[in-house]
């Protein structure tokens, strides 16, 4: 196996330490001296004092043991007693206040999941049905001992969101007339239940280099859809029903994006119209795209915005580290590319015509507010559609199944094939992010890859499939001949059906091969991993060569049989046996931030070396020593481990220096 040179240009993300909030600091200043001197659990974990009492040392050991525990789920202990809903009219709200999150939100200033009171509902509309309690299980943000440690992302990566002076943040939500819909509420949680549930909540990992990337992706999804439990989300909503989460917590997603960040992106980067940014408007019942040619300078973009046009950034994760981290971590959980678009809409405007998409959509309202209306797919064949639709006219749409206003901190999920449109209200702009998941991930995509494989193998094995068609085939089969009922036609149809049933049943090996091809496609599409500081010192991304007195290059690493290694991520590579007999490792370590900008990255290895990669895949997330690689010689074991590490695919348990 040939060694690779050290990868250049690898960027690192911030660490996972807590940031101190000005709000939290002010709150602490108002406490008594006794309260100030008390060391919190968060401080014990991440910023312990120089001198600890015996009790504090024991408490710190206990907390460290808790956060290291693997397999801890974020679900609550109580089960939902409600039956599974069958309609698509979903609206999740919770009543109890949640602790402050990573965005430094004060619990006394809107750190709650929003719930409309009965009086507000009555004032909004008399048509709306009274809510029915569904008995949803409630989860909380990432916590330790009741303190929310935050959005599970790298801190210090982005500044706090700021609203543009011309577009102040909207006031509190006022009454909005809505279509009648069933509201499913989260039940109140008493203090006893809340305390018991805290033991099961996911916590901020301490040993970053030992975490499971799939579980990290699940943890980010949990934060995204909180207070809906992940298991409940997949049981009740995923690919079936829309879900609305309202929080009255405008800062919940503020670390990801802001109005000001858009201006910074335009100023600091060469953003191209049509490639990176679209200017759209919906007027007279039609959507118009108004992209000029060339670079999207800030002054030009804001002129369009001032005229009522919507701004869509097509690849925001290229420019925003925090958003990129959300996408790159979630793609580990979903095993597919997680894309993102940013939409900025001026007041009293609509940028897009009603349509449906071919993705599972998570709409994250970051700033402002926007009214969303969702409709059933026009045709049954449009449900879970594999392609996006054209634009619909308002006359083609029926009554909306959901008509809701999203405010900053709210979230809306809806399945692919759901017709939707959104409009801002007078006096209120909107900034939201749409995360797109599960595009072209259906069984149909697997079968499209699988059946050619099956047919190719069957043709080689079966003479019957290679025999020529009868001479009269064109005269008895075809669209024109469909009303022609004759014995020869029926016999030909029966022959084709028998050939399919006899020779085209896929084997397990065929299915494995097809799935490998889909996974290879994911490696080409995926975002590159963000390497954290704890990972950088254990990977090639932190390696630096030096020169000795004679000018020779000296590496700062050296593998031996006792070196412990593991894969960088659970899905960082795919081992594929190609048709020509070669064995290749496809990976996304060096992928571009732009979609499929480069050709797929791969390493070609020897057939006898594949078993070593298989062992590494099976061992993840645990470390194994180089000596445990099932290769014949020690030299080959060290060579293979070194080569994989030099390509950025492996991480050592301990830094070399």
UniProtKB/Swiss-Prot annotation:
Q: Which SUPFAM superfamilies match?
A: Clavaminate synthase-like
Please state where this protein is localized.
Nucleus
Q: Which cofactor does it need?
A: Fe(2+)
| Key words of the record | Chromatin regulator, Dioxygenase, Iron, Metal-binding, Nucleus, Oxidoreductase, Phosphoprotein, Repressor, Transcription, Transcription regulation
Q: What is its EC number?
A: 1.14.11.-, 1.14.11.27
Phosphothreonine modifications at: 139
Q: Reaction catalysed by this chain?
A: N(6),N(6)-dimethyl-L-lysyl(36)-[histone H3] + 2 2-oxoglutarate + 2 O2 = L-lysyl(36)-[histone H3] + 2 formaldehyde + 2 succinate + 2 CO2
Q: Which residues carry this modification: Phosphoserine?
A: 133, 140
Q: Where is this region: Disordered?
A: 1-141, 165-198
Q: Tell me which family the UniProt entry assigns to this protein.
A: Belongs to the ROX family. NO66 subfamily.
| Task of the protein | Oxygenase that can act as both a histone lysine demethylase and a ribosomal histidine hydroxylase. Specifically demethylates 'Lys-4' (H3K4me) and 'Lys-36' (H3K36me) of histone H3, thereby playing a central role in histone code.
Protein name per UniProt: Bifunctional lysine-specific demethylase and histidyl-hydroxylase NO66
Q: What is the lineage of its organism?
A: Eukaryota, Metazoa, Ecdysozoa, Arthropoda, Hexapoda
